[in-house]
Amino acid sequence: METLCPAPRLAVPASPRGSPCSPTPRKPCRGTQEFSPLCLRALAFCALAKPRASSLGPGPGELAARSPVLRGPQAPLRPGGWAPDGLKHLWAPTGRPGVPNTAAGEDADVAACPRRGEEEEGGGGFPHFGVRSCAPPGRCPAPPHPRESTTSFASAPPRPAPGLEPQRGPAASPPQEPSSRPPSPPAGLSTEPAGPGTAPRPFLPGQPAEVDGNPPPAAPEAPAASPSTASPAPAAPGDLRQEHFDRLIRRSKLWCYAKGFALDTPSLRRGPERPPAKGPARGAAKKRRLPAPPPRTAQPRRPAPTLPTTSTFSLLNCFPCPPALVVGEDGDLKPASSLRLQGDSKPPPAHPLWRWQMGGPAVPEPPGLKFWGINMDES
């Protein structure tokens, strides 16, 4: 039972654990701080992802987000000169990471803001950053210019309270997107602060910052004029192409086979409403076209044949073989055929006389006797 039931895990760890990326200050180590490759990769990813997050741009009434600067004893990471270029502006070189150094932290806080200004001072773009500011730790003086540099968003620490924000002029434009502004202003752009009645206009090729909320007057004129002038032109060819496509489909052999060659459209019915052909048919279309039927002349119908008033039908005449006996007038049977004819009357058509051969016996002889050649008359 002891092996099946594992020891219960404590809900709260016995000893507080720090971040997996930060070393625990258990032993005051002397020398260069060591970090794992995974920690370095995570730090680099965070440093590269923070400026990209601000590239989405603030809203019309919002302030641009700034990346925080780790300072003082709150910063668990105090790397030396080994940090990559993307991370140098986040930390300042200090003493031992294990032992908190308040004086070094204050010096780093004071030097964090003007360091970028000194880099910009070399180019002559922003002279107000060249002055060393002795502000209390954790706070940088706000520049007198209402327009702020892009690098100040990444290097300056977050302002502790919004009370310092009203220093911006009421006529100043809202902060623009940091990613859309170049790191250093062009050579021809003046750096004097704008007057109280004018708003600073950044030098941009397409002026996307100006047209963020209200497009320039020239832009709406072009779309307004384009639908009225260009809409009828493409509409007519589209209708013609669609009509031509429908005509080809309805005249195709596959369509005709599917419809059972039912001419369901007025243009396909053969009649006076059919439009005349534009030109002589070519190729297979000429073979499929049926010639026009010749005009039919009104011919008089043949007169009905005159039928006899009395019927000439006789059952004995149509009988296959002449009967031997028939019923007489007295109701008795009598021979059907007789050679005793009265006067010049002819025997009936079914009389065997008409079947006799000339020169043969009047009474047909049996086939056996005829075959033997026996003559009954002679016997």
UniProtKB/Swiss-Prot annotation:
Pfam families: EPOP. GO terms for biological process: neuron fate commitment; regulation of transcription by RNA polymerase II; stem cell differentiation; transcription elongation-coupled chromatin remodeling. Its main location: nucleus. Residues 311-359 are annotated as: Interaction with SUZ12. InterPro entries: ElonginBC-PRC2_ViralRestrict, EPOP. It comes from the Eukaryota. Keywords: Chromosome, Methylation, Nucleus, Phosphoprotein. The modification Asymmetric dimethylarginine is found at R52. Residues 1-27, 72-105, 137-244, 264-309 are annotated as: Disordered. Residues 221-237 have a biased composition (Low complexity). Residues 172-186, 291-306 have a biased composition (Pro residues). It is found in: Nucleus; Chromosome. The modification Phosphoserine is found at S15, S19. GO terms for cellular component: chromosome; elongin complex; ESC/E(Z) complex. Residues 39-48 are annotated as: BC-box. One of its GO terms (molecular function) is protein-containing complex binding. Associates with the PRC2 complex, which consists of the core components EED, EZH1 or EZH2, SUZ12, and RBBP4, and various combinations of accessory subunits including AEBP2, JARID2, PHF19, MTF2 and EPOP. Within the complex, interacts with SUZ12 (via C2H2 zinc finger domain); competes with JARID2 for SUZ12 binding. Associates with the elongin BC complex. Interacts with USP7. The BC-box, which mediates binding to the elongin BC complex. Scaffold protein that serves as a bridging partner between the PRC2/EZH2 complex and the elongin BC complex: required to fine-tune the transcriptional status of Polycomb group (PcG) target genes in embryonic stem cells (ESCs). Plays a key role in genomic regions that display both active and repressive chromatin properties in pluripotent stem cells by sustaining low level expression at PcG target genes: acts by recruiting the elongin BC complex, thereby restricting excessive activity of the PRC2/EZH2 complex. Interaction with USP7 promotes deubiquitination of H2B at promoter sites. This is Elongin BC and Polycomb repressive complex 2-associated protein. It comes from Homo sapiens.
